[in-house]
């Protein structure tokens, strides 16, 4: 039987800043992906594609109908699955997802994972609003379900999403195939493993309210509060931690209101006291991402990804969709084809080593940082200098002080990955 208990350790935090909350004329997106401690997250570049009409697409567990054209995407994903925890496409759409439990039962059947929905939306959408509708359509047609971890004991949940583009952001929260969405055209917003959309609903499933009435969750009188109606009546202890992280995230965003930058978002993702930078028992922050999406369409979007666990001891490296962009082999996990435990039924009966090259180097460095204080300080300084170079490159691009050739921008992420790996050698 699939486990759907909210008491199981699982947490994520997503943030977005839309002008005037941002210090610059840009939307800024950020996410910490909190996953099983030993799970490896890889960074994968998928080029744009043209596909045969009517062809089928294999996702993590099920096939869906492919569309004619797909956008190029950069994904940070658990290396055993098809979808992604967070990512962006070439048009500047960013999405992060989170686990959520509601009054709607979590199905045990295999369908689309929330992470599959995320990737499909990035590949098929040109705006955040379009991505909301893509996910809603896929939910209606295929549903969501299946184990979300690489373990013989299934672990299932529904999903919430934070979606952003160059002009605005959306929060999309689901309960089975039902959903509600909220548009954010200014200010800062965060989500943390709980329903957070109240009465301010910008779009919703056509049967959302009638279903709530039929279940006896809403009388039909007064304002319809999505979070109040669909949240579990008796909140488990685990959800109290999510509430605390949500409040802490709100407070940090409010503290920096009008002055939010990529550096501010990175600082929030590194905050251990709040639990946003997670390291608890069998779970931890396994990868992080911050994206800067300028409102000026002539300026490139810059996506910073760690590809390694614990952002407080990792490097945010800049990725830009430009000429010459390709897959960085150092952050790509090995593949196992038909022998992969996710492909053999029953699934996940064995374990394989999915660590990529940068993960191995970083893992060794973390061990050193815990044992040797002096060397740890030297290594952390190297990480900070490298990250600062990436942030300075971002500032130069946004101000127009730097106009490097497109080929150079396309290979920027690869160059930073190589330098980080050298620092760990």
From Swiss-Prot:
Any one GO MF annotation of this record: dipeptidase activity
Coiled coil: none
Pfam families the record matches: Peptidase_C69
Signal peptide residue numbers: none
Biological processes, Gene Ontology terms: proteolysis
Catalytic site positions: 12
Family affiliation: Belongs to the peptidase C69 family. Secernin subfamily.
Descriptive protein name: Secernin-2
Species of provenance: Mus musculus
């Amino acid at each position: 039987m699939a486990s759907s208990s909210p008491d199981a350790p699982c947490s994520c935090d997503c943030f977005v800043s839309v002008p005037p909350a941002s210090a610059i004329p840009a939307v800024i997106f950020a996410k910490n992906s909190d996953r099983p401690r030993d799970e490896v997250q890889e960074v994968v570049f998928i080029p744009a594609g043209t596909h045969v009409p009517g062809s089928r697409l294999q996702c993590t567990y099920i096939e869906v109908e492919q569309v004619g054209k797909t956008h190029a995407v950069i994904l940070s994903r658990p290396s055993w699955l098809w979808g992604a925890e967070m990512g962006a496409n070439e048009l500047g759409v960013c999405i992060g997802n989170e686990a959520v439990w509601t009054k709607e039962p979590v199905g045990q059947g295999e369908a689309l994972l929330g992470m599959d929905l995320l990737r499909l939306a990035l590949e098929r959408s040109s705006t955040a609003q379009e991505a909301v509708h893509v996910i809603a359509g896929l939910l209606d047609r295929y549903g969501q379900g299946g184990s979300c971890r690489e373990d013989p004991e299934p672990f299932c949940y529904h999903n919430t999403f934070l979606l952003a583009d160059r002009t605005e952001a959306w929060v999309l929260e689901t309960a089975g195939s039902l959903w509600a969405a909220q548009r954010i055209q200014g200010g800062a917003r965060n989500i943390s493993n709980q329903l957070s959309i109240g009465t301010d609903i910008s779009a919703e499933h056509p049967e959302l309210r009638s279903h709530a009435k039929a279940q006896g969750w809403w009388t039909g009188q007064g304002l319809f509060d999505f979070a109040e109606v669909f949240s579990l009546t008796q909140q488990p202890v685990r959800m109290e931690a999510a509430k605390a992280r949500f409040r802490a995230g709100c407070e940090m965003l409010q503290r920096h209101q009008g002055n939010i930058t990529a550096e501010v978002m990175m600082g929030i993702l590194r905050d251990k006291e709040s639990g946003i930078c997670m390291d608890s028992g069998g779970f931890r922050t396994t990868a992080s991402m911050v994206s800067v999406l300028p409102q000026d369409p002539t300026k490139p979007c810059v996506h910073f990804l760690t590809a390694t666990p614990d952002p407080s001891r990792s490097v945010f490296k800049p990725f830009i969709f430009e000429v010459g962009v390709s897959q960085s082999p150092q952050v790509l996990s090995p593949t196992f084809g038909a022998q992969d435990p996710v492909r053999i039924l029953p699934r996940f009966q064995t374990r394989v080593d999915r660590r990529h090259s940068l993960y191995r180097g970083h893992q060794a460095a973390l061990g050193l940082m815990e044992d040797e204080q002096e060397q740890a300080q030297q290594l952390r300084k190297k990480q900070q200098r490298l990250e600062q170079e990436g942030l300075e490159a971002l500032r130069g691009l946004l101000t127009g002080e730097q106009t490097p050739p497109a080929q150079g921008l396309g290979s920027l992420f690869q160059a930073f990955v190589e330098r980080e790996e050298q620092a760990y050698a």
